[in-house]
Amino acid sequence: PPPLQQPSVCFLRLRIPHIELLSWLKQLQVKLHNPPTINYPASQGQMDICITSGSQDGLCKVFEMMVNPGDNVLLNEPVYSGTLQALKPLGCNIITVASDEYGIIPNSLKEVLSKWKPENSKNPKKNTPKFLYTVPNGNNPTGTSLTSNRKEEIYELARKYDFLIIEDDPYYFLQFSKSWAPTFLSMDIDGRVIRADSFSKILSSGLRIGFLTGPKPLIERVVLHTQVSTVHSSTFTQLLISQLLHQWGEEGFLAHVERVTDFYRNQKDALLAAADKWLSGLAEWHVPTAGMFLWVKIKGISDVKQLIEEKAVKKEILMLPGSVFYIDSSAPSPYFRASFSSASPEQMDIAFQRLAQLIKESL
């Protein structure tokens, strides 16, 4: 019989996560991040992995497990709107930390944390922050990435004030620098980092398979959450991905990732060329270091919402106003997010040419 027939039948009947896929992913995480907790006892935060129905599914389960009404959580604005939509219904207090073109500003985080004493973390009544959520590479929407030094400072603050770090890193494999930045997972000596990875940006978003890496006690609870909610991620897509990864091997997988990154790097260069050509003097931006987004500030217009959502759409330009990435989405914002994931260089050029004309008409 064909080689997939017997394993696939057994696999679909058992309806459990594919053990071979979990094993492959664990080896990959060790190769890429070398987590200090890999050989820890389970009670001390030993690294573990579970498969989720996309990284967003895993993150939502973590939020639901950890957050109670009135809890304090930390994140930097602007932030992925899906994260805000997942956190707001839980009734937590979202405390924002300032960021710039290099990600979260450690001094801003220190200032926020100065409201508490480090020993307050041992007293539940003091309500110290439970976790810091961050997208460290190619942040959506800004395209910025945290520097290694800032990550180290942030991790030390997490140790000092005893909060967890949720490292949402779907664009990790789309870093444009040849040397990938060290991750929070790679420096986690305490078992306080929960890392979310995704296949959506490097294989297909429709597969809806991601994976969480973190301390075993927390990962086991995510698995329990899955068993009583989504039951399990699609066994069929798990099998497809597992067969593909095992056929590629680690070297083949990383070669595929490099080809995908080359594509996005070329897309980024094309969008920047169009921006330089048409938006110079009208807007400003920082060059993204990873991911698929450009964060643009239009000069002289305090709120671009109508320009982007109405006027631009009529000209067949599809972008998002910056306001949707803030807790108060009704507040005016001069920013918009452009994506270079799928448009051709010619389409990017035409879009920014039309946008430039709209900006001039609005000034």
Language-model-detected regions and their locations in the chain:
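Conserved N-terminal helix/loop that builds the PLP phosphate-binding region
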Residues: 1-6, 114, 314, 360
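Conserved core of the PLP fold type I
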Residues: 6-161, 166, 172-190, 194, ...
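Conserved glycine-rich beta-strand-loop-beta hairpin in the small C-terminal domain of fold type I
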Residues: 15, 19, 49, 257-272, ...
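Conserved core segment of the aminotransferase class I/II
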Residues: 189-265
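Short hydrophobic/aromatic beta-strand micro-patches
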Residues: 213, 295-297, 339-341
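Short, conserved charged micro-motifs
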Residues: 302-308, 345-350
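PLP-dependent enzyme catalytic core of the Aspartate aminotransferase-like
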Residues: 314-315, 329-363
